[in-house]
Regions:
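Extracellular loop and loop/strand-boundary signature of outer-membrane beta-barrel proteins
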Residues: 77-82, 135-144, 186, 194-199, ...
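Outer-membrane beta-barrel signature, preferentially recognizing the C-terminal barrel domain
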Residues: 1-24, 76-91, 98-101, 146-150, ...
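Gram-negative outer-membrane beta-barrel transporters
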Residues: 28-180
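Outer-membrane beta-barrel strand-turn architecture
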Residues: 5, 15-19, 31, 87, ...
Length: 267
């Protein structure tokens, strides 16, 4: 294998149009050549790539199969290799605003990411696959079910009055579809009609967290809170995932839970 190489373009701006208001916007374009991953994009691409490519024994994809003395396929080997290309483009933003409210101060912090494209070209024989808005291999690398939503939003509102701060946080992830559909488009094949037993689409999810923090004697900080206030369930992907039937790196798998935290300042 050869080393990966990347070209990165980032453009950002910080604007303060009003007192107490700050807006930050960043555009990124990351292009990785010779990205390291499963040969041919994994078995999901090696098998159809060999078959639809004419099953030529000289085809590198077909050479991944091992045959026994009778000519029957006995094994499939998909080693780690250099992929053709991975390119990701998107926009990050953050809006922070604070203003007085009664005898306290109200703060808003809105941030998010819009994934414009996440192109994965698993080998030079097929077109790049746009993994933005998809889950599962090859978009999920080697862990089936990893979701790549186009929209991620993180919003927080807090009100500080005296020694108390009340806050509400909102998290949002847009829906995603099975990467098999994007894979078939790249292979110029019709959309799959006999998809295995798993979800073909993961619905969008909203999560709300609430907390109250008290400053005590200028040395201690007591926080009472609840995460996943509405007890929103994680999106399940059936047999496409080995980690609790969902993507625990994105979705909340624990449900509603309460917590108490104490911090002490050392002098």
């Amino acid at each position: 294998m050869s080393a990966e190489s990347a070209r990165t373009l980032t453009i950002g701006a910080v604007i303060q149009p009003l007192a107490g208001l700050t807006v930050t916007v960043d555009y990124y374009d990351i292009n990785i050549r010779d990205a390291i991953g499963a040969f041919g994009g994994g078995s999901g691409f090696v098998v159809p790539g060999c078959i639809f490519g004419g099953a030529d024994p000289a085809d590198p994809l077909c050479q991944a199969f091992t045959r026994d003395a009778d000519g029957f396929v006995s094994d499939l080997t998909v080693p780690t290799a250099n992929l053709a290309r991975i390119r990701t483009r998107g926009i990050d933003w953050q809006v922070a605003y604070g203003l007085p409210l009664f005898t306290g101060r109200l703060h808003f912090n809105l941030s998010g990411t819009r994934l414009l494209a996440s192109d994965v070209q698993v080998n030079s024989n097929i077109d790049p696959i746009d993994c933005a808005g998809s889950f599962g291999r090859p978009c999920g690398n080697t862990i089936q079910g990893t979701a790549t939503p186009r929209w991620k939003l993180f919003n927080r509102a807090s009100w500080t009055i005296g020694p108390a701060t009340f806050s509400l946080r909102h998290r949002y992830f847009s829906s995603t579809k099975d990467a098999l559909f994007a894979q078939n488009e790249a292979l110029n094949q019709p959309a799959p009609t006999n998809v295995p037993v798993h979800a073909t689409k993961l619905q969008a999810r909203h999560y709300f967290d609430a907390a109250t923090t008290f400053d005590i004697a200028d040395r201690f900080e007591l926080t009472l809170g609840v995460n996943n206030l509405t007890n929103a369930k994680p999106s399940l992907v059936g047999n496409q995932q080995v980690q609790a039937n969902t993507d625990p790196s994105l979705y909340d798998v624990l449900g509603r839970r309460f917590f108490v935290a104490v911090k002490a300042k050392l002098r």
